[in-house]
């Protein structure tokens, strides 16, 4: 009998048999039969679901709120090796240590932000603007280019090439109109052209943006007395024309010119505010009540309201015995200005905050107080002793600055200006719509602290208004000198009689 030799494969099979995991079939064969477990009933499942829902709705939220409150009020501890993910305030340049809560707030989402310590904390500086970085870089590049252009213009100015200097500075002013260095160089070029008023304005504007600029202070001290003398001479010229106007013969030609000025004033004062009616259309509305096709009802009502306000000024305010101006006078003018366009807000001080471009007037709770201060200033003895042109211009500016109404502030301010001027013997001042940009620019300069440009603007157009009357009287007809007067048309006579009748009834 042969005996088979044991091989390595037999050993491997033996080990595999010993280490093999029992299969499910082997377990079933060896283990006794177990009873099958029965499932839960439907009633039990429903009851458990209701209990879980009630717990989630009533117990879980207060528990999480309490936990969040504990985390919020927990003491803070320093973690030298960590940095805050959000840094709301200015970045500290002294200490690199950051603060983190002692108990971390639990989160149910994976934070996708990789939190790495910022290595530039010691060299950081606060960012003082909210402009986009691209815009800041663009503005910085413009200012840099403007300064280089100003240096080139300065070299041309010293070499005597003023034309080239002016051309370069116009480019620099277009790039950085508010830069003090640019304004100072532009002022020096204006001064060399003997444009002292414009040069002084450049120095004043430079000081508004940089009050401590020594070069601007020295240059302003040189031009200020010269410009003051120019302003006094200009005001004296206007007063001399006013005296000449006062001695004009009250003829039919003068009355006709007054009627034309009336229509011109209504047209220009509403056109400055954006009204698109032409002078002929404005006149047609006032004379015949015609409705202009293609124009809004509001534009018609603005013209009618200004007509009512002018009649109130001519027939009531100018006939008052005392020359004091009250808050009620201003409110009554405004009530007529907006009486047809916006009767709800007409004659009422605003109760909401308004915004005029980049300018923000006073809050509504201070409007009445500011308006009372303005009226007290108007009626003060020292103010009454001022030049009427200066007083009227400053009163206009103060009313616009307070901005007491939601709409119609500019029209009411121009009525107040003319009320003061006409009480001093001046004819109505027309501020043309063609000079709208100059009008608002001079008011902007007044916001920077210099009222003289706006006073000059009012004086210039007051002189133009008087010259219009004098020129009309001199060129209308030679019959006025001989005592003969041209006859009015039937329509002109009818309108003049209507205005005079209304004035007598109002007084």
Swiss-Prot record:
Question: Domain Fido: where?
Answer: 325-460
- Stated regulation of activity: The side chain of Glu-273 determines which of the two opposing activities (AMPylase or de-AMPylase) will take place. In response to endoplasmic reticulum stress, mediates de-AMPylase activity. Adenylyltransferase activity is inhibited by the inhibitory helix present at the N-terminus: Glu-273 binds ATP and competes with ATP-binding at Arg-414, thereby preventing adenylyltransferase activity. In unstressed cells, disengagement of Glu-273 promotes adenylyltransferase activity.
Q: Which residues cross the membrane?
A: 40-56
- Region Disordered: start-end pairs: 482-507
> Where does the record place its TPR repeats?
146-179, 180-213
The catalysed reaction is: L-tyrosyl-[protein] + ATP = O-(5'-adenylyl)-L-tyrosyl-[protein] + diphosphate; L-threonyl-[protein] + ATP = 3-O-(5'-adenylyl)-L-threonyl-[protein] + diphosphate; 3-O-(5'-adenylyl)-L-threonyl-[protein] + H2O = L-threonyl-[protein] + AMP + H(+)
Which GO molecular-function terms appear in the entry?
A: AMPylase activity; ATP binding; hydrolase activity
The residues responsible for catalysis, as annotated, are 403
The annotated topology with respect to the bilayer is:
Single-pass membrane protein
Question: Site Important for autoinhibition of adenylyltransferase activity: which residues?
Answer: 273
List keywords of the entry alphabetically. Answer: ATP-binding, Endoplasmic reticulum, Hydrolase, Membrane, Nucleotide-binding, Nucleotidyltransferase, Nucleus, Phosphoprotein, Repeat, TPR repeat, Transferase, Transmembrane, Transmembrane helix
Q: EC number(s) on record?
A: 2.7.7.108, 3.1.4.-
- Residue positions, PTM O-AMP-threonine: 351, 475
List of residues binding ATP: 273, 356-359, 407-414, 439-440, 447
Q: Where in the cell is it found?
A: Endoplasmic reticulum membrane; Nucleus membrane
Kindly state a single biological-process term from the GO annotations of this entry.
defense response to Gram-negative bacterium
Q: How does it assemble?
A: Forms homodimers; homodimerization might be required for adenylyltransferase activity.
**Its biological function?**
Protein that can both mediate the addition of adenosine 5'-monophosphate (AMP) to specific residues of target proteins (AMPylation), and the removal of the same modification from target proteins (de-AMPylation), depending on the context. The side chain of Glu-273 determines which of the two opposing activities (AMPylase or de-AMPylase) will take place. Adenylyltransferase that mediates the addition of adenosine 5'-monophosphate (AMP) to specific residues of target proteins.
What family is it from?
Belongs to the fic family.
Q: What name appears for this protein in its UniProt entry?
A: Protein adenylyltransferase fic-1
The protein's gene is named: fic-1
């Amino acid at each position: 009998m042969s005996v088979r030799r044991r091989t390595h494969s037999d050993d491997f099979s033996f080990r595999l048999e010993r280490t093999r995991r029992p299969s499910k079939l082997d377990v079933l064969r060896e283990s006794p039969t177990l009873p099958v477990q029965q499932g839960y009933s439907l009633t039990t499942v429903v009851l458990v679901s209701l209990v879980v829902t009630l717990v989630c709705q009533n117990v879980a939220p207060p528990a999480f709120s309490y936990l969040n409150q504990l985390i919020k009020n927990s003491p803070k501890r320093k973690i030298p090796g960590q940095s805050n993910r959000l840094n709301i305030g200015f970045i500290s340049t002294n200490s690199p240590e950051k603060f983190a809560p002692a108990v971390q707030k639990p989160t149910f989402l994976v934070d996708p932000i990789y939190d790495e310590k910022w290595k530039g904390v010691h060299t950081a500086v606060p960012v003082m603007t909210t402009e986009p970085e691209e815009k800041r870089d663009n503005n910085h590049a413009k200012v840099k280019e403007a300064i280089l252009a100003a240096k080139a213009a300065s070299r041309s100015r010293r070499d005597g090439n003023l034309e080239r200097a002016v051309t370069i500075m116009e480019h620099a002013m277009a790039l950085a109109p508010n830069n003090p260095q640019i304004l100072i160089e532009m002022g020096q070029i204006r001064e060399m052209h003997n444009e002292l008023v414009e040069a002084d304005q450049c120095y004043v504007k430079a000081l508004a943006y940089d009050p401590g600029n020594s070069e601007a202070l020295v240059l302003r001290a040189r031009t200020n007395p010269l410009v003051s003398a120019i302003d006094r001479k200009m005001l004296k010229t206007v007063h001399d024309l006013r005296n000449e106007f006062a001695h004009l013969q009250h003829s039919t030609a003068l009355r006709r010119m007054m009627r034309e000025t009336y229509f011109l004033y209504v047209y220009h004062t509403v056109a400055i505010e954006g009204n698109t009616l032409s002078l002929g259309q404005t006149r047609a509305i006032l004379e015949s009540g015609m409705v202009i096709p293609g124009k809004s009802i509001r534009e018609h009502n603005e013209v009618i309201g200004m007509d009512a306000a002018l009649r109130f000024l001519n027939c009531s305010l100018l006939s008052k015995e005392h020359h004091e101006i009250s808050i009620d006078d201003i409110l009554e003018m405004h009530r007529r200005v907006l009486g047809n366009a916006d009767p709800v807000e007409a004659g009422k001080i605003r109760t909401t905050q308004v915004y005029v471009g980049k300018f923000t007037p006073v809050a509504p709770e201070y409007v009445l107080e500011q308006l009372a201060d303005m009226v007290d200033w108007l009626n003060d003895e020292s103010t009454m002793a001022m030049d009427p042109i200066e007083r009227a211009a400053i009163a206009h500016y103060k009313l616009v600055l307070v901005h007491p109404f939601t709409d119609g502030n500019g029209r009411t301010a121009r009525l107040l200006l003319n009320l003061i001027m006409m009480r001093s013997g001046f004819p109505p001042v027309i501020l043309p719509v063609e000079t709208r940009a100059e009008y608002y620019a001079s008011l902007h300069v007044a916001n920077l602290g210099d009222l003289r440009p706006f006073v000059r603007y009012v004086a210039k157009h007051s002189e133009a208004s008087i010259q219009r009357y004098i020129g009309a009287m001199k060129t209308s007809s030679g019959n006025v000198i001989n005592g003969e007067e041209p006859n009015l048309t039937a329509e002109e006579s009818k309108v003049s009689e209507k205005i005079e009748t209304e004035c007598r009834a109002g007084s």
